[in-house]
Amino acid sequence: MDAFKLLTRSTKFKAGNSLSSTLPSKGKAENPQLFRDAEAEKLLESNAFGKKRKRTQAAGDSDAEDGNAGDLDFFGSGKRSAASAPSKKDEDGPSEQKDASDSEGDDSMDEVERRTILNSHKIKVTDMRDFEELQPTQPQKEESKKKKKKRKQQEEEPAQTLTKKEQKKARRLFPEPLVSFKQLRTKYNISRRLAENIAEQGFTVPTEVQLGSLPLLLGDQSVPQKSGTEKSTEPDLLVVAPTGSGKTLSFMIPVINKIVRHHHEKPEERGILSVVIAPTKELASQIVNEGRKLALGTGVKITLMKKGMRVVERDDEDDSKDVLDEDDSESLGSEDDEKATAKNSKGKAPVTKSDILVTTPLLLVNALSANRTKPLATLPLVRNVVLDEADVLLDPLFRDQTLDIWRSCTHPELRASLWSATMGSNVEDLAKSTIKERKDTLSETKSYPLLRLVVGLKDSAIPNIKHKLVYAATEQGKLLGLRQLLHPAAASSTDIRLRPPFLIFTQTIPRAVALHSELRYDIPPEAGGSSRIAVLHSELSDGQRSEIMKQFRKGEIWILVTTDLLARGVDFRGINGVVNYDIPNSAAVYVHRVGRTGRAGREGGIAVTYYTKEDIPYVKSIANVIDVSEKLRGTDEEKSVQKWLLDALPDLSKKKKEELKKHGVKARQTQGTKDDKKTRISTKSGYERRQENKKKALISASRNRKSQPKSGADSGSDDDNQGWQGLED
C-alpha cells in the first residue's frame, strides 16, 4: 500500500507528467512544424484563400475556381481545377513538363498570401547586401536639357537618408514558400530519383526552415534580383533555425540536385563539386549517412573525409597517381576502403574521386597543405560550400581553418550557405566581409544576393520542450538530484519525470569520466547494469566513439554522459530529455544542448539544468533563454523561471562572458587543489580515497623502478669481465 496515496486521497493535484504522456521516443510527430498556430489555420480556411484568384489567362479560358475546403493544404495553396489549365495542350511533351509549367504559372501566390504564410510561421527573409546594391540600376534614357538641369540640381542637394526602420522594411523579402515536398518535382523540377528518395524517407510536410530555404536555393522566381543578374540566381544564404528543424535536408537537397544537373550538362567534368564542413566527426558522419539516403541511385557520390586521404593532385608531386573509382568512393568509411588504402600503403594514397566531400576543418586543411608543409592547394571545381554549425566554425577555434578552405575554392560561381541555430552579428559580418573580399580578389563583376533567413526568435530554444532550472546548492546536491531522476520515488505533481534514453552534459572530460564512474552501478543488473551507462568524449579513439554512438542509437545504452562534443548537430530522434549537470558556458551552448531532444516537432522532451552556489553569477543568460522559450510556447502552464528570480539574478559583464565562454566556471577548473573538495564528483569517504591514492602511488613507484637501469651488480659486472689488472701506481 502506498502511504502517500492513502494520505492524499482527498487532495486534487494538477495533472502531472504521467508515464503514458507523449514522449519523443514514442515516434514521429504528426506535424514537424513548430510555429503553426490556430490563427494560421483560421487564415488558411478563410475566404482569403478559398475565393477565386484573378489570373492572366489565354483568350477563351474561364476563371479558375478553387476546390473544396478539404482540398486545401497546410499553406492555402489548394488543388486547382482542370479549368485553370491552358486550353492549348502540348500532347507531344511529357506530362511532367506540363505539371511544372502549370505549377509555375497558376499556383504562384500573390504577395499578400506569401506575407501571411511567412509571418504565421515566423519566417523572416532579409537581404543582407549594402543598401546601395539593393537599388535597381535602370538604363539611362536620352534626356532633354531641362531634365538634365533638374537632375543635376537634385544630385547637388543632400540625399535624403532613410531611417533604420525604413531600411529594414526595404530589405524584407517575401519569397513564395514550399507547400509540400511534391512541389520539388512539379514546380522546381528536381531529379526524379531524388524526389523518389525524399518520398521514401517519409517526408511530406516541410518544416519552417525547409519551407523558406528550399525555394531560395532551388531557384525562386519571386525573389527580386538586382538588374544585370539572372532572375533565378542562387543566393548566398545565412540560415538561423531551431535545433531539430531539418537543416541538413534543407542544404543537401539543393546540393545533390545541382550536382545531378551538372553531371548531365558536363559529364566529362568530374571532381569535388561541393564541400560540407562540420565541427565534429560525429556530425560529419551523420551528414554523410543522411546524404547517401537522398543520393541513392542518382550517381552522386558522398565521401566522409578521413585522415591520410588525398583530395587534389598537386603540381609538386609525382604524376603517377592512382584515382579512386566511383564505386570505391561510395564505400569509403567501410572495410573495403581500408583494404583499398592498405593496397596503396607502399606508395601514396589515391586521389579521392567524389562529388560531395563532408569534412571537419583540420582534416581538409591538412590534406590541402600536405600537413602544413606546403602552400594550400586550390579546389577549382567546388561550386558550393556549406558551413553546418557556422557560428562554431567561424569562432576563433576553427576560424582560420574554415576561412582557408573557403578561400581555396576559386570557382567564380561559388555559392556559400551558413547554417546554425545560433548566429551572432559578428558571424554575419565575417561572412559578409569574406564574400566581398573573395569577390574583389577574383575580380568578379557579377553580383549575387546575400540573404538571411531566420525562423522563430533568433538564438532561442525550441518551444516544444519543458525546461527545469533546479538549484542544488552543492556538488553533492546535484549528484543527489540526478540519482532521484534515475530512481524516482512516489510521483507528485511537481516531480520531474525523465525516462531514458537521455543525455548528461558536463563541463570537462575528467568530470564526465568521474560522473560515469559514480553512476556506473546505479542501474540494477536485471535492467542491464553498467552496460546501460556510457561516457563519450574526444579523448576516446574513433572506433570507440563510433561504437558508443551505434549502441546509443540502437537503444543498448540508455544514459550517455558526455561533454559539448555532442551538443551540436547530432540527431537523436528518440531522446526523451537532456540533463545539464554542469551549466553551459553560454546561452548559445544551452540552446544547442537542449536541442538534442524535441527533434522534428516531437513533444514531451524535458531539459533539466542543475546549478550550485558557485554558478549563480552565470545563470541569468540561461534563465532568459528559458523565459523566452516558454513565452513562445504560449501555454498557461506555470513558468519554471519566475520573474522574481530573473530580477534577483546578477547580470554578467561582457569580459566575464568571454572568460566563461573560453574556460567555463573557474570553480570546476581547480583540480588537485584545496578547492577541489567543493567540486569533486564522488561519494567516497576520505579514508577510501586515501587508500586508493596509496595504491596508485605504489603502482607508479613500481613502474618507475622497473624503468630505471640497475646500479649495483650491473655496474660491477663490467669490471669482473676485464679481470685483475694489477695494483695501481
Swiss-Prot record:
Indicate, by first and last residue, each region the UniProt record lists as having compositional bias (Basic residues): 696-708
* Residue span of motif Q motif: 183-211
Q: Which SMART domains match?
A: DEXDc, HELICc
Its cellular-component GO annotations read: cytosol; nucleolus
The question of whether RNA-binding is a record keyword is answered with yes
Record keyword tRNA processing present: no
Supply the EC number(s): 3.6.4.13
Q: Quickly give the catalysed reaction.
A: ATP + H2O = ADP + phosphate + H(+)
Q: Which residues form the Helicase C-terminal domain?
A: 481-649
Composition-biased stretches, type Basic and acidic residues, lie in 87-101, 686-695
Query: What role does this protein play?
Result: ATP-dependent RNA helicase involved in 40S ribosomal subunit biogenesis. Required for the processing and cleavage of 35S pre-rRNA at sites A0, A1, and A2, leading to mature 18S rRNA.
Protein name (record): ATP-dependent RNA helicase rok1
Organism in which the protein naturally occurs = Aspergillus niger (strain ATCC MYA-4892 / CBS 513.88 / FGSC A1513)
Q: Where is the organism placed in the taxonomic lineage, from the top?
A: Eukaryota, Fungi, Dikarya, Ascomycota, Pezizomycotina
